[in-house]
């Protein structure tokens, strides 16, 4: 994975890029959060949905909840950008809906809207 620091409306955002499904498992998430939070010291993260292995969207894996908790613990914001129409699980749809009401993690289709949300205080 690559992390590029960009500026949007005067605020730094870490954009994560890489191979599809390169975020596999909680260890990869811990590494990513550590890299962004401690090495780059940027609390706002933009990532493509394609980076996340689809199996991790299974709520039974605990990945989604752990990701949200880690982001909250480190006082970060994460926007995951992409198409979430593949989601069939009512529980996951509810998780995404609830996340999108909060100020920690959002799942958005539009990159510009994601960036605009990330830079809000």
Where do the language-model regions lie?
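Amphipathic, Lys/Arg-enriched alpha-helical "gate/interface" segment within cytosolic domains
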Residues: 2-121
């Amino acid at each position: 994975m690559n992390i590029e620091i960009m500026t949007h409306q005067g605020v730094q955002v870490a954009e994560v890029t890489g191979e599809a499904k390169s975020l596999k498992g909680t260890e990869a998430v811990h590494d990513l959060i550590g890299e962004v939070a401690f090495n780059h010291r940027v609390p706002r993260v933009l990532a493509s949905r394609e980076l996340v292995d689809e199996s991790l969207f299974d709520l039974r894996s605990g990945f989604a909840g752990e990701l949200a908790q880690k982001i909250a613990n480190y006082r970060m914001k994460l926007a995951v950008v992409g198409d979430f129409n593949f989601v069939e699980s009512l529980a996951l749809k509810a998780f995404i809906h609830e996340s999108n009401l909060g100020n920690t993690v959002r799942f958005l289709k539009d990159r510009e809207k994601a960036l605009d949300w990330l830079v809000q205080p």
